[in-house]
Amino acid sequence: VVAECENPALLFSGGKDSVVLLALARKAFQLGDRPVHLPFPLVHIDTGHNYPEVIQFRDEQVAKLNARLVVGHVEDSIAKGTVVLRKETDSRNAAQAVTLLETIAENGFDALMGGARRDEEKARAKERIFSFRDEFGQWDPKAQRPELWSLYNAKLHKGENMRVFPISNWTELDIWQYITRENLELPPIYYSHKREVVRRKGLLVPVTPLTPKLPNEVSEVLDVRFRTVGDISCTCPVASTASTP
């Protein structure tokens, strides 16, 4: 990607998959004992609904690497009118796609490396490792390039871009085993911690300004951990006392 693309970047949210991807990138550009210098920036699309611990972890990792961080804010897209939500507490997961395209256009990125995996959902299962997008940022399954062994075609016309998923064929078990083997640091909410929650529709819902306790609910402080670090509005923890992967 770095050899063939003019302006690549790596998507880094602070989640476990992007942590693994960043670790692989660091290994790829490690020269002896010298500090790693990544020849591309890190990109994060901030929905404004992230857990504070994850944003803090993201910033700490960027500072340790002395890397450049480009942040696209969904709030900016809302202010411009390119994203319209019914109410403030609506999930912003889908809205991220608009902000991502705007961030790509504003910075002229022609390739974005991401930590998506085929086993996560059906839509991702169909994507190639090098996933071609047209000048409108659209993915057309009929327009994808053949991928023979380790041979990939990264050629693009002006305005087109590539999404690259180096760990596409990894499973979630692979991710956790790699994190354990390499002793990779993760946001603390991946491990057991005390958190105020309410029991709602079979879920443990964190009590936050975005997800407040309802009048008929009773909150409790439990030992919990998160399996994923998505938005506050759509990510709930599970009861756990586990302090390791």
Please give the residue ranges for each predicted region:
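Nucleotide-activated chemistry modules centered on ATP-dependent adenylation/adenylyltransferase
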Residues: 1-11, 16-245
